[in-house]
Amino acid sequence: MPLNPILAAVLAQRTEVSAPPMHEGSPEAARTMYRAMNAGYTREAVTRVRDEDADGVPVRVYHPNPGVVLPALVYFHGGGWVIGDLETHDHICRKLANAVPCVVIAVDYRLAPEHPFPTPLDDCYTALNWVTQNATQLGIISGKIAVGGDSAGGNLSAAISLKARDENGPAICHQLLMYPVTDASFDTPSYADNAEGYLLTTDGMKWFWHHYIGDEVDPAQAYVSPLRASNLSNLPPTTVITAEFDPLRDEGESFAKLLAQAGTSVSMRRYDGMVHGFFAMADLLEAAQEVFEFSAYQLAASFKTA
């Protein structure tokens, strides 16, 4: 399927701007650029939004109906572990909270390269534990807590599910993985076919990985590359979303297949004509709105059976 015409126009517009790509600048410059890119999206009203401290990790709690105890989604933002924060994904969290409906807890984990692996993962796990331990005070139904995230946030979600299983940690009833990073290698056909020209580039991913794990961390260990985990059994039901024109497409789909082979209930959808990051563009793209509706359906279904 050809590239979506709206996305083609967006990409052409960005090509006309002479600014260098993120990976040619500093992490600080990339963060500023990313905040600007995400500043204009519509932010839905949510009844109660509060910033909290989750045992030292900043989080933002979105509760669409504070008078009702609801399930929860602990959300880890994307941005290659280097960029992104509570503001860049605020519109996504608001929309998910209203659509499911559920309480959404967005996690402002520390970023690489100042805080490389495993610090972002540890922050996310700390936040998940805090949510579990404080469910009653947060208006959350204990035992109905999911994790999710986009891109690097999908990587963190998958790693958190593995870690929680390995350490007999918090029970996770679902993982929602939006075009997740699952492998620290660059040898798939989607990396070759979509190396540049579709927002996320192969060189950009190499830059992100370098800042996250450097040269001393084994890139094949499970909490870095969940696709390489030797044991993918006993993991929560999973939803995986991929995009046709995305370097990460193949590793996301391979992860979904391996999870299914290990006995996990998996629902995987590829959105043709889309690029990495399209989930954030519900203001522009019908497909992004469809993903929100599908994600809300998947989460609600898991919450009912948890």
Task: Cite the ranges covered by each PLM segment.
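A glycine/proline-hinged amphipathic helix-loop "lid/cap" segment
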Residues: 1-62, 304-306
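Hydrolase active-site cap/lid region
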Residues: 162-217
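Short beta-strand element of the alpha/beta-hydrolase
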Residues: 69-79
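Short amphipathic alpha-helix adjacent to the substrate-entry channel of hydrolases
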Residues: 87-106
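Gly/Ser-rich "nucleophile elbow"/oxyanion-hole loop immediately N-terminal to the catalytic nucleophile
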Residues: 132-147, 167
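Alpha/beta-hydrolase active-site loop
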Residues: 115-137
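Catalytic active-site module of serine/aspartate enzymes centered on a nucleophile-bearing elbow/loop
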Residues: 284-306
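Short beta-strand/loop motif that positions the catalytic acidic residue
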Residues: 240-242
